[in-house]
Each structure stands twice: as C-alpha cells, then as structure tokens.
C-alpha cells in the first residue's frame, strides 16, 4: 500500500542558539511531498533551508510541530527507533560529499548498509556494485575516494544515499561544489532515480536551472515558506 505522502511536516518551529543569540529559524513550516516528485527549496542564505532538511531527515528535532514519514508521525519514537527509521527511509546528499577518503567508492556506499545491518557482506558488496554501476562508476568501485574527481565523488555520494533503498532523498546543495556540466549530470541522475523508482526528492539549491526543472519550487524567507509554485512558474527570486 502506497501512502499519499512520502514525507510531510506540519507547523514546524525551530529555535537555534541561546539567550540573546537565540534565532527563530523556522516559523510554522508545513510541507507535503508525494512519491515520484522532485521539490526544490530556494531562498537567501540563512532563511532556514538547511535547518528544514535536517529536521525532515530526523537529524534534528523540531521545537514544535510534527514530521511524518509515509503518513506516520515520528515524534513518539525512541532514539533507536528514530535512527532506524532514518536509516531505512531517508537518504542524504550534501554539498560536501563527506566520503571516507581512504575508503574505496564501494566501501563508502556500503556504510549505510552496515549501519542498518540487514544484509550479509556478500549482499552488501553486490548491491553497492550495482549502485555504482547505475551512477556510471562500475569501473571505479575499488578506487579510494580521494583519487576520484569532484563529479565522481558526488556520484558516489548519490549511490550511497540509495544504499538502503530509501523512500525519500534529501539533498542540501547537492551540486553547489560542481561545475555546470557536472551539476547538470548529477541532477539528471537524481531525476531519473526518482522517476524510475517512485521515490521523492527534496533539495535545497541556489541554482536557478536546477530549481526550475523541479516539479515544485518552495520559496523560503525568514524561516517561512512564503510560496509554493508548480514547474513552469516564473519565480521572482530568479528574475
């Protein structure tokens, strides 16, 4: 049975810092993401994009409001259950790849599988090899990540985000460190993964071309989503 929403949040509030330095980072944010769709969150630096992704990814709790995965609220879960839910249902891609530089491409992709603990070593090696083949790195699976180009490292990061076959992929500036050609390749790869696998993708980006190719664009300002636009809408922030 497929849930209506892969990921959703309602009335999220988040404060960062203490005392005089306390900042109201998210203000009543609500968002629904359905399977097979690609969403972009755009807005100026400091508007709350990354904070929102961390909360939706169950890496940081909200101060108020609710996050649900496949229509199931998660606030009641224990820390262990929350970690399992995160490992099983959510894949992450960041601007800086956070690869283990002395690990091979294959070993990096296997890290989330080892954490979840559901596959044998043989199965993990087979799945990681298949994922690297899917992102065009089948011939480099045994190469240490420090010997890969920036574009190749980001493709390893994409493969790693898919290690546990997540329902949702969250990407924080996934192409921000890449040149135009590699940015386009990485985003096209993510689009294909979403379309073919029925997954959902939410990414924070400053790249107009990438944002405008998404199914939905959500504009953020001062911790709020101020507007949501379907693909094809002219967005004022990019004019």
For the regions a language model picked out, list residue spans one by one:
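Short coil-to-helix "N-cap" segments within the ABC nucleotide-binding domain's helical subdomain
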Residues: 80-81, 104, 116-133, 142, ...
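Conserved ABC ATPase signature
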Residues: 144-154
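ABC ATPase NBD coupling module
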Residues: 20-23, 74-91, 121-122
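Conserved catalytic motifs of ABC-family nucleotide-binding domains
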Residues: 165
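Conserved ABC transporter NBD signature motif
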Residues: 65-73
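Short coil-to-helix segment of the ABC ATPase nucleotide-binding domain corresponding to the Q-loop/switch region
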Residues: 103-112
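Catalytic Walker B motif of ABC-type/P-loop ATPase nucleotide-binding domains
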Residues: 169-172
């Amino acid at each position: 049975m497929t849930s209506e929403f892969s990921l959703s949040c309602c009335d999220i509030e988040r404060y960062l810092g203490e005392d005089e330095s306390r900042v109201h980072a998210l203000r009543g944010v609500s968002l629904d993401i359905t399977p097979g769709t690609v969403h972009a969150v755009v807005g100026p630096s400091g508007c709350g994009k990354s904070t929102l992704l961390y909360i939706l990814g169950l890496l940081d709790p909200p101060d108020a409001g609710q996050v649900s995965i496949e229509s199931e609220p998660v606030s009641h879960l224990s820390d262990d259950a929350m970690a399992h839910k995160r490992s099983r249902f959510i894949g992450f891609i960041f601007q800086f790849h956070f690869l283990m530089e002395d690990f091979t491409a294959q070993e990096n992709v296997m890290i989330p599988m080892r954490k979840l603990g559901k596959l044998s070593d043989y199965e993990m090696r087979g799945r990681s090899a298949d994922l690297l083949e899917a992102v065009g790195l089948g011939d480099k699976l045994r190469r240490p990540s420090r010997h890969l180009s920036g574009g190749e490292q980001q493709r390893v990061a994409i493969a790693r985000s898919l290690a546990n076959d997540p329902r949702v992929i969250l990407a924080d500036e996934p192409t921000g460190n890449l040149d135009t050609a590699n940015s386009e390749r990485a985003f096209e790869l993510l689009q294909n993964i979403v379309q073919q696998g029925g997954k959902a993708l939410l990414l924070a980006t400053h790249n107009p071309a990438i944002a405008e190719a998404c199914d939905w664009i959500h504009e953020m300002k001062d911790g709020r989503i101020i507007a949501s636009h379907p693909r094809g809408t002219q967005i004022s922030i990019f004019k």
